[in-house]
Regions:
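Bulky hydrophobic/aromatic packing residues
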Residues: 62, 66, 70-73, 92, ...
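Conserved active-site and cofactor/substrate-binding residues in soluble primary-metabolism enzymes
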Residues: 59, 87, 120
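Conserved AdoMet/S-adenosylmethionine-binding subsite of the radical SAM
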Residues: 93-107, 111-175
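Short linear motifs at secondary-structure transitions and domain/linker junctions
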Residues: 31-38, 85-86, 137-142
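"Short basic amphipathic alpha-helical interaction patches in structured regions
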Residues: 73-76, 85, 123
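A generic structural signal for short coil/turn motifs at secondary-structure boundaries
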Residues: 80-81, 175
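Short cysteine/histidine-rich metal-coordination sites, predominantly Zn2+-binding motifs
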Residues: 82-95
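N-terminal [4Fe-4S]-dependent radical SAM core
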Residues: 2-65, 69, 73-80
Length: 175
């Protein structure tokens, strides 16, 4: 029995074409053109308490370099042009620390999209975290870290940073 598979062109302005679907590094650059302005980054919302890690305060980022079928973060990933507002690292840190203090959290993060978009913004945010009592959980799919060794090494200098790499699956159960 032969199963015919229709080849789908996944390319659009937010998803550069690639022979096997899309190129996550090209998609990183495309996403950054939408969600980064200088040292400012787009967020859908700031500082919400979550139960993960025994309690964490998280900001919801906009933009990603993957297009996972089972992703729960639909609008911030698929419609970054019309989602969120731009915030400076100081604004994000202030909102996170205020909410974290209210809930007694020592962990803060920015999640629900790709955490490594906007390196300047990320590094400035991590410098603020390093001078604080908090630990920042960087949630990433790891594509940019694997592609750019210097970026990964630069992250290693931050003492209050925990990097969590999320390995994606090929079906809903694995994801």
């Amino acid at each position: 029995m032969v199963i015919k598979v229709k080849k789908v062109n996944m390319a659009n302005r937010n998803n550069p074409t690639h022979k096997d679907g899309y190129d996550p590094i090209a998609l990183t650059r495309a996403a950054e053109r939408v969600v980064v302005r200088g040292n400012k980054r787009k967020y859908a919302r700031l500082a919400r308490p979550l139960r993960f890690y025994g309690g964490i305060t998280s900001a919801q980022e906009v933009g990603c370099n993957l297009r996972c079928k089972f992703c729960f973060s639909d609008k911030p990933v698929r419609r970054p042009h019309s989602t969120g507002r731009f915030y400076s690292p100081q604004q994000v840190f202030n909102a996170l620390s205020k909410e974290a203090d209210k809930h007694g959290h020592k962990l803060i993060s920015a999640s629900a999209s790709e955490g490594t978009l906007g390196q300047e913004h990320l590094f400035e945010l991590l410098e603020l975290v390093d001078d604080s009592k908090y630990v920042f959980v960087l949630e990433t799919n790891g594509m940019t870290l694997g592609h750019d060794r210097d970026f990964a090494l630069a992250l290693a200098r931050f003492k209050n940073l925990h990097v969590r790499v999320s390995i994606k699956g090929s079906n809903k159960k694995e994801y």
